Design a protein with these regions (language model features):
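Histidine-acidic metal/acid-base catalytic patches
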Residues: 26, 52-53, 74-199
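Active-site acidic/histidine proton-transfer and metal-coordination neighborhood
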Residues: 1-94
Length: 199
């Protein structure tokens, strides 16, 4: 989504190498960042141009191009849902991340449940992210720096209700990541299994 056309085309070319690598490894998708500059509508236009070209290349290799909510306007699930609809190609979709609806640059918290629902309409992967548990609130998880708190069970129910049947990635971003990452991932996996069993 670079505003400079030459730089945008160079970015498309660089991403083609990742598409090639993904195809070689037998992957179904690569994740890209919806990064750009300008107004919301300007970014939508620039991203549509660059990613459409990447999708046309990746389609020949059977690779999907997925957007993850990951900073800037992309932290808004409604923006990514509109972007995928605008590109309107079968190998372009979304990868909703449960925890990435907070834009640290602008300190904006986008609606996470509504954003997840919007992205799930054309989701091709899901990142089941959790932080640290909230005491006495089952399945609630809270980031240790940002004001992000959410109901992990509700997020999982949104995925179930959407009819999504693809892959889940499990991600943990709690406090003292280096020390606690494995335990955090295993706890998140346990939550998922409990929620599935009770649904």
């Amino acid at each position: 989504g670079d505003p400079d056309k030459k730089a945008r085309m160079e970015s498309v070319k660089l991403h083609q190498a990742w598409v090639d690598a993904a195809a070689e490894m037998g992957c179904h998708s690569i994740r890209v960042n919806a990064s750009s500059a300008g107004s919301r509508e300007e970014q939508l236009k620039l991203l549509t141009d660059g990613v459409t070209q990447l999708c046309e290349y990746s389609e020949k290799l059977g690779i999907n191009i997925l957007f993850e909510n990951h900073g800037g306007f992309s932290s808004d699930g409604a923006f990514l849902a509109k972007l995928v609809d605008t590109i309107n190609l079968p190998n372009c979709g979304n990868l909703p991340d449960f925890g990435n609806f907070y834009n640290r640059t602008t300190e904006t918290q986008y609606p996470m449940y509504e954003g997840t629902e919007a992205m799930l309409e054309k989701a091709m992967a899901v990142s089941a992210k959790a932080y640290d548990p909230v005491p006495n609130k089952p399945y609630y998880t809270q980031h240790y720096i940002t004001p992000v708190v959410f109901d992990f069970r509700k997020m999982m129910h949104l995925v179930f209700e959407s009819g999504y049947t693809g892959y889940y990635g499990i991600e943990y971003e709690g406090e003292n990541l280096e020390k606690n990452e494995k335990a955090g991932i295993l706890r998140t996996k346990k939550w998922m299994e409990e929620i599935w069993a009770a649904y």
